[in-house]
């Protein structure tokens, strides 16, 4: 059975923590709140994450070296439930109220996604006029991709309208987009920390 991209990236995130020897410390575990400190066993802040779970509200607050995030389910949930829900990456992202950049954008991947759109629109890549336009477009496109996405104008948007139509922008927000490694690290860290604390008898299956 082929491993999905999300599973592969979660395994990589887990290995990143294992390599650094991360250890979970239970800071608080009251009727409502569970606070977990997840950091290297030597106490350094490299890849440090702090997790706060509000079980009554069903919210997860993440802070630390890997960025910040607030995710909310709006109904009571245990720590184990939330850790399990987060394994579904896009479901977890859908619960974000705010977060450090959750997506990365890459100009090479953006070009690949646009090429796929052009092929679906039946564009003839052998046409000499198109080839000239396409070469110029690929040279210019990296100027319009940054940490926040793909924001074309000028000749780049003119190219897209010419070959994809005036509704080319529909769905363009996903071009070149991938989930940031920090999201996989947040998920893997919470799962590993909860497992460690449960195995140590510091969290029960009901927590």
Regions found by a protein language model. Give the residues of each.
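Short N-terminal edge-element motif at the start of the domain
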Residues: 2-63, 68
């Amino acid at each position: 059975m082929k491993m999905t991209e999300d599973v592969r990236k979660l395994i990589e995130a887990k290995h990143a923590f294992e390599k650094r020897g991360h250890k979970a410390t239970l800071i608080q575990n009251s009727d409502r709140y569970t606070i977990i400190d997840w950091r290297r066993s030597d106490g350094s802040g490299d890849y440090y994450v702090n997790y706060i779970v509000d079980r009554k509200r069903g919210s997860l607050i993440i802070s630390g070296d890997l960025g910040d995030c607030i995710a909310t389910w709006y109904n009571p949930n245990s720590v184990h439930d939330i850790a399990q829900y987060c394994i579904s990456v896009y479901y977890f992202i859908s619960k974000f109220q705010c977060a450090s950049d959750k997506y990365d954008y890459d100009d090479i991947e953006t070009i690949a996604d646009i090429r796929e759109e052009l092929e679906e629109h039946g564009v003839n890549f052998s046409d000499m006029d198109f080839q000239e336009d396409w070469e110029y477009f690929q040279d210019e496109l990296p100027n319009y991709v940054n940490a926040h996405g793909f924001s074309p104008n000028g000749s780049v948007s003119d190219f897209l309208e010419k070959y994809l139509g005036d509704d080319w922008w529909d769905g363009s927000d996903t071009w070149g987009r991938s989930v940031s490694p920090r999201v996989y690290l947040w998920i893997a860290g919470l799962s590993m920390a909860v497992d460690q604390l449960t195995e140590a008898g510091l969290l029960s299956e009901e927590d």
